[in-house]
Amino acid sequence: MFEEPEWAEAAPVAAGLGPVISRPPPAASSQNKGSKRRQLLATLRALEAASLSQHPPSLCISDSEEEEEERKKKCPKKASFASASAEVGKKGKKKCQKQGPPCSDSEEEVERKKKCHKQALVGSDSAEDEKRKRKCQKHAPINSAQHLDNVDQTGPKAWKGSTTNDPPKQSPGSTSPKPPHTLSRKQWRNRQKNKRRCKNKFQPPQVPDQAPAEAPTEKTEVSPVPRTDSHEARAGALRARMAQRLDGARFRYLNEQLYSGPSSAAQRLFQEDPEAFLLYHRGFQSQVKKWPLQPVDRIARDLRQRPASLVVADFGCGDCRLASSIRNPVHCFDLASLDPRVTVCDMAQVPLEDESVDVAVFCLSLMGTNIRDFLEEANRVLKPGGLLKVAEVSSRFEDVRTFLRAVTKLGFKIVSKDLTNSHFFLFDFQKTGPPLVGPKAQLSGLQLQPCLYKRR
């Protein structure tokens, strides 16, 4: 045997770098060639055994129970704080899957790796690097063939391989999987509301007269909505609405004719078209019905406090409501007849004798341009001291005093007046005698404003 100090010192380095390729020195002679080869082989085997005992390869890592316990102590479990739904789905997974990817190396680890790299170039790796390699080998999904190649490499190649095997750092702009977002109470209500809207959007509209149908069961079949009925109902509603608008337009036209012309022209209009008076009366009643107090009811209340023997003449009676409300005998006059008790005539010329009635009533009937003729006719049929009651829309009076002075010139005096109502004024006059002025005298106070209705 011969001493070989150089081989003994270089053995650890060769063990760290990889498999040693033996190159024996050239033999001095052909005779000693076989013996020297055997000696070299024995030396190499001894060196290999020594290197394997000092630096066990990372490939021969056995998942023994002791290593598992050490790994569990060093790498504690990381609790996952996902939502309840995510926790239920992840209960069956392994504990190693619960752990996140290995954290990125810090600056200290990078420096330590550089030092280890230098030590690997010099001769050997530290024990801490071996442990770190074992952990990375267990966690990283690397094939066995690639792992064997990377373990044997040292130097710059080994450093590049370790950097490529490390998990990449997550950039701040990159999106990471997040646990499912839980909805707030307001968002949940909005979502339910949108669902109901989408559900009702495709349901057919129900007819208002019909009750909501019961929900169909699995056995019963859903009958299609009859389109003809809904179409006819809509058409009928449209016709009724158009007819109502047409009636309103005709009422406004008739009302304008009554206030802008004499009573004789209005009488001819209703004689030619009897239905026009019915239409006008229906529109008039719909307007007066909205008032808090109707003037005919107020006049009837006053007359009920007087003797029932007094004879009453109702100029412009309409539907004879005053005659139906009191016990007194009543003469009803109007341009058209809505009741058998009505006498159709021009109110400027009623078929009564002179001084034959005790009370004359004009309830919203001073219409037309010849109001003076109406009041002179009332003076003719009233007894001396008879009562004249006038109720008219308050908006028609520009000046109440001028109206009262004009009426007194026609043979009356004012007894009482009520201007408190917001819709109409009520006056009581008493006959004092015949008119004080001639028929050609002009009385400007009797020119009232026409009561015109606006389009609604």
From Swiss-Prot:
The keyword Transcription is assigned to this record: yes
Residue spans of biased composition, Basic residues class: 183-200
Entry binding sites for S-adenosyl-L-methionine: H281, G316, D334, D346, M347, C363
InterPro entries associated with the record: RRP8 (IPR007823), RRP8_N (IPR042036), SAM-dependent_MTases_sf (IPR029063), UbiE/COQ5_MeTrFase_CS (IPR023576)
GO biological process: cellular response to glucose starvation; energy homeostasis; intrinsic apoptotic signaling pathway by p53 class mediator; methylation; negative regulation of cell cycle; negative regulation of DNA-templated transcription; rDNA heterochromatin formation; regulation of G1 to G0 transition
Residues carrying Phosphoserine: S62, S64, S104, S171, S176, S223
Coiled-coil segments on the chain, per record: none
Ranges of compositional bias, category Polar residues: 143-153, 161-176
A molecular-function term among this protein's GO annotations: histone H3K9me2/3 reader activity
Enzyme Commission number(s): 2.1.1.-
Catalytic class of the enzyme: transferase
Positions of region (Disordered): 1-39, 52-231
GO cellular component: chromatin silencing complex; cytosol; eNoSc complex; nucleolus; nucleoplasm; plasma membrane; rDNA heterochromatin
The organism's place on the tree of life at top rank: Eukaryota
Locations listed in the record: Nucleus, Nucleolus
Keywords linked to the UniProt accession: Chromatin regulator, Methyltransferase, Nucleus, Phosphoprotein, Repressor, rRNA processing, S-adenosyl-L-methionine, Transcription, Transcription regulation, Transferase
Gene3D superfamilies: Ribosomal RNA-processing protein 8, N-terminal domain (1.10.10.2150), Vaccinia Virus protein VP39 (3.40.50.150)
Family affiliation: Belongs to the methyltransferase superfamily. RRP8 family.
PANTHER family: RIBOSOMAL RNA-PROCESSING PROTEIN 8
Subunit structure: Component of the eNoSC complex, composed of SIRT1, SUV39H1 and RRP8.
Role, per record: Essential component of the eNoSC (energy-dependent nucleolar silencing) complex, a complex that mediates silencing of rDNA in response to intracellular energy status and acts by recruiting histone-modifying enzymes. The eNoSC complex is able to sense the energy status of cell: upon glucose starvation, elevation of NAD(+)/NADP(+) ratio activates SIRT1, leading to histone H3 deacetylation followed by dimethylation of H3 at 'Lys-9' (H3K9me2) by SUV39H1 and the formation of silent chromatin in the rDNA locus. In the complex, RRP8 binds to H3K9me2 and probably acts as a methyltransferase.
Name of this chain's protein: Ribosomal RNA-processing protein 8
Organism: Homo sapiens
This protein's encoding gene: RRP8
